[in-house]
């Protein structure tokens, strides 16, 4: 299974390009899932599906075309499906502090839960082979980096803290629960954590395997956006992932000759030259600005035709080496 991550600064067009890529893959006969791992989902909106996913109230993949499936992780559903014991304990703690009802349940949704739920699905599909390609519409850069670092972070916790914490709680729980109003986590809480870790086991290896996972960084021909893309490029490499394309979205097309856009074009040309120079030898693709919003299957198909050549496979493996590698030297990396 191929995993394609579309990441970049918020507002650069990640969702539209991920959706267009998924359409092209499905048209080529590949069973494709496009999944949003952004807490502020807009993937269904990009396909102009209206309230289809909202009305379905599901976290499961929804078929939206031949060989094409869409998934937006619904964290409230995931809490019941995968986080039962953890959610129940955290909710009980908040209720002890005075929060009741919906407020306590909402506060029990901890940072990272949505990303970890998405990671579990990716690993599930990798193991089952249900899809040939999974296209991930990532959150803005910082959240995307947290997503790819989750397996390493959780592995460290499981190796160095979890066992000790679990044993300590088992020993002191009978006494502590009698003395204070806040109960210590039950054994089911720790078993739930162990089950979650088991569900993502091995996904870090898949993410670092360039024959499985590729990162596509989306940027605009703007200096501020470029700087964040440069940082993301280094950070993804630091985490062991391979960036195989830089995609510059919303480039002014040649037919725009109005004088109002002259200075914008000059700035874009200067930034495009800097992009080519900085990211070489990683291929840089340019996608023109369209005169209308890229919304719905027809326009996304049109977008795909500008992003990929006719007959080109977006899932093809084009790079297997990372431009940056890092090695630890004492207390720093080189």
Residue ranges and their predicted role:
Residues 2-7, 12, 17-28, 32-210, ...:
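Flexible phosphate-sensing "switch/lid" loops adjacent to ATP/NTP-binding sites
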């Amino acid at each position: 299974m191929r995993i394609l991550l579309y990441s970049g600064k918020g507002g650069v067009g990640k969702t539209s390009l991920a959706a267009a890529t998924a359409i092209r893959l499905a048209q080529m006969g590949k069973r494709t899932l496009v999944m949003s791992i952004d807490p502020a989902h807009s993937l269904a909106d990009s396909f102009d599906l209206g309230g289809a996913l909202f009305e379905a109230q599901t976290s499961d993949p929804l078929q939206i075309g031949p060989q094409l499936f869409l998934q937006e992780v619904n964290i409230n559903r995931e809490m019941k499906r995968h986080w039962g014991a953890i959610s129940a304990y955290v909710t009980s703690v908040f209720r002890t502090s005075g929060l009741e009802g919906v407020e306590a349940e909402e506060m029990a949704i901890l940072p990272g839960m949505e990303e970890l739920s998405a990671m579990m699905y990716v690993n599930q599909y990798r193991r089952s082979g249900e899809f040939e390609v999974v296209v991930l519409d990532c959150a803005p850069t910082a959240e995307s980096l947290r997503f790819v670092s989750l397996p390493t972070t959780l592995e460290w916790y499981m190796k160095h803290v979890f066992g000790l914490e679990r044993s300590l709680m088992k020993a002191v729980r009978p006494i502590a629960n009698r003395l204070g109003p806040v109960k210590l986590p039950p054994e089911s809480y720790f078993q739930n954590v162990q089950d979650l870790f088991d569900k993502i086991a091995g996904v870090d290896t898949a993410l670092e395997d360039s024959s499985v996972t590729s990162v596509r960084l989306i940027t605009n021909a703007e200096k501020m956006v470029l700087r964040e893309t440069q940082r993301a490029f280094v950070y993804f490499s630091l985490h062991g992932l391979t960036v195989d394309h830089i995609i510059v979205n919303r480039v002014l097309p040649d037919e725009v000759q109005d004088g109002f856009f002259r200075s914008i074009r000059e700035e874009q040309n200067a930034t495009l030259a800097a992009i080519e120079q900085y990211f070489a030898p990683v291929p840089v693709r340019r996608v023109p600005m369209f005169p209308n919003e890229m919304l719905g299957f027809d326009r996304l198909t049109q977008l795909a035709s500008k992003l990929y050549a006719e007959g080109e496979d977006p899932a093809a493996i084009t790079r297997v080496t990372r431009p940056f590698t890092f090695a630890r030297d004492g207390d720093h990396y080189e």
